[in-house]
A protein has these predicted regions:
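Conserved NAD+-utilizing ADP-ribose enzyme module
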Residues: 2, 27, 47-53, 58-153
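Extended catalytic/binding region for NAD+/ADP-ribose chemistry, centered on the ART fold
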Residues: 23-47
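Short aromatic-glycine-(Arg/Gly/Cys) micro-motifs in beta-strand/loop hairpins
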Residues: 3-26
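A broad, structure-centric signal for solvent-exposed, well-ordered loop/edge residues
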Residues: 14-16, 41, 66
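Short, conserved beta-strand segments within well-ordered enzyme catalytic domains
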Residues: 6-8, 33-34, 55-58
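A generic structural signal for ordered alpha-helices
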Residues: 16-22, 35, 82, 86
Length: 153
């Protein structure tokens, strides 16, 4: 198996990841969020005050976990994000797929509010740059995330 690495942008070194269950509801619910796109983790880190740190993790095999993987933005992805952003819980250990950034989230809110149709939503998001996120939703899933190193930007 090829080694797989994921990245987490922050203002601190996160050598012991934790499941965060506070703040606003996120795309895939509460958990520890990473990406396989180093450039995206750098963008996340640059949004932080003071320090800009990219944490690098090696992933163990994920086959034993209850996973939900979205290969693209599709109807199931949209429905899942809407439910998670509304605070509905799920029973997955790991969820992976495209990210609804602020612009896409605005379109989702417009769709939820009935301001745009589902067809208009898909038209608006189809030209967005590729994004990726993987969330580790519980302590069991965090066992697959092995801290390798961190670096400052």
């Amino acid at each position: 198996m090829t080694e797989r690495f994921v990245y987490h942008g922050s203002n601190i070194i996160v050598d012991k990841p934790k499941i965060l269950t506070n703040g606003f509801f996120k795309d895939f619910g509460y958990g520890f969020y990473c990406t396989n796109l180093e450039k995206q983790a750098k963008r996340w880190a640059m949004t932080r005050r003071n320090n800009h740190i990219v944490n690098v993790y090696k992933l163990k095999e994920l086959d034993a976990f209850n996973k939900l993987i979205f290969d693209s933005m599709n109807e199931d992805w949209l429905n899942f994000i809407v439910n998670c952003r509304r605070g509905l819980e799920h029973n997955y250990d790991v969820v992976e797929g495209p990210m609804a950034d602020d612009t896409i989230w605005n379109f989702i809110e417009d769709y939820i509010g009935g301001d745009i149709s589902k067809e208009a939503f898909w038209e608006l998001v189809k030209f967005r740059y590729p994004t990726h996120q993987i969330v580790f939703c519980n302590e069991k899933a965090l066992q697959a995330v092995i801290f390798e190193r961190a670096y400052s930007l």
